[in-house]
Amino acid sequence: MGVIVNAKQFTEQFWNLTCDRLGAPYTIQYYDFTSSMMHNSGLFIMKIFAVITKDAAVAMNLTYLSIFFIAGIISYFVMRNIKINCWVASLSSAVFALSPYMLFRNIGHIVLTECYFVPLSILLCIWIYERDDVLTLDKDFFKRKINYVALFFTFLIANNGIAYYPFFTCFILMVTAVSKLAKTGKIKQGLRGVVAVIMVCFFVVLSILPGKIYNIMNGSNAAAVDRSGFEQTELYGLKIAQLFMPLNGHGWYDKYIDIYNENAFLVTENSSAYLGILGMIGFIVLMFCLFTKRDSLLKKRLACLSELNISMVLLGTIGGLGSMFAFFVSPMLRAYNRISIFIEYVSILAVALLVNELIRVIKDNKKVVSAWAKRISLVLTGCIFGLMCLFSIWEGYPQLATPAYDTNKMNYISDKNFVENIENSVEAGSMIYHEYPEYGPVNDMWDYHLYIGYLHSKTLKWSYGSIKGRDEDKWNKNVGSMPIDKMVSYLKEQGFAGIYIDRRAYEEEELTTLEGSLKQILNEEPMISDNENLSFFKF
């Protein structure tokens, strides 16, 4: 629901950090939520779709669907940059773009589904590992075009993934810097990774600067974002077993998946860490590459990926480096299992490199006299790899519950008609009070259900949406605690036009009492939606 709210805001205003139609009688300021300022790339894409379509629902859906295309295209660019065959790059990028991680996160966690810049993070590491001209601090720094490209990458990375992806990128850049320093013994070489980290951090600070200024002017608000402590990093840490465990077994091994999920400890969102068939093969290959000679470009490149891979496992795993960081430094990042998408990409990239090398060997093999034999070998290689990729996509596809499309459509139309009727019955720009201001699901009312009024209206202002810990939240709690007769009198004095009730939030007896009291006080029957989920009492 929060995604479509952003889309709605983009159809009515420039950006999404304020909203004068929520939190009435106040204006909502979202500057307390740092995460709202740390996925600007996805919001920018949504803004484009919102401006073009003028429809929040369409803009939201197009934004979601575009993720898979953008992820595939960027991955293809990265693989072609390191000279991987075009069709190998295409197939491998398709596997990444349709990864179990992204499909599982879905639109509900779209800020994490938008992991299309992960390949750029890996490419930065490869450039620093292999090239001596990238981000080298010397007099020719601004003469090399590659540095501008690298800096642009850091800008994109910093504005994606609500702190997680920038943090993971900084980690692997530091791993690359240490590796480069250890291999060359030159501080200058290690500093190139540090420069990249500094630039990512610079752009992150730049993106959250409006929030920091707001906090300085209005005071900090610890209540807005709850982080209980370092122990949550254990709850949401990475489990190596789940890198190899699908979300579903397509009827083949569901029994074993269920046994693990029902009996193992700490099975949470980390179940989305599954690498897929191609990713698992690459992961195992990279583990072996830790111990191989590095006497060719391919082996050196695989060595780079293997170092990144094992380092990311150590960071993400339960009780690993991430837990130590949360305990000793900051617990604000808690779900280190989310590094699994980085692990998946380096694993897929490893397989792509090996297949690419196989193609090169076949083409350069002078022992094969017949050109037809080479062609047949290349065709067979392509077919086998293509089938592997298709099977990996199919096998990794999570069989999530199918939404009740007909019911959702019926409710959507009912909600839309109901809110339009409210808007037609009161003056433009009127304030509407939500009887139930609390956050979180209550009975059959889901979290964010109270956004329905805002989504389907054009000018009405709604009391829902207040930021915890701020004045509007205190006002809402104060009004919500009043006896119903005093509440009605006070709301009339404040200029509200009526009370909106989501009936799903109440037990039957409680709802009957509430609506009965309002009928008696206002001497008026309520408007009721066609699906009977909502009611409205006009003052």
Predicted regions and their residues:
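Extracytoplasmic
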Residues: 372, 384-539
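Membrane-interface helix-loop-helix junctions at transmembrane boundaries of multi-pass membrane enzymes
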Residues: 184-195, 262-270, 283-317, 367-368, ...
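Membrane-interface junctions at the ends of membrane-embedded or membrane-associated helices
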Residues: 80-84, 127-149, 178-191, 290-298, ...
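Membrane-interface coil-to-helix junctions
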Residues: 1-71, 99-115, 237, 244-265, ...
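Periplasmic/ER-lumenal interhelical loops and adjacent helix-loop junctions
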Residues: 208-289, 465
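Membrane-helix boundary/interfacial segments in multi-pass membrane proteins
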Residues: 102-113, 225-228, 257-274, 296-349, ...
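Hydrophobic alpha-helical transmembrane segments
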Residues: 38-42, 59-75, 273-289, 344-351
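Membrane-embedded helix bundles of polyisoprenyl
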Residues: 64-82, 87-181, 197, 201-207, ...
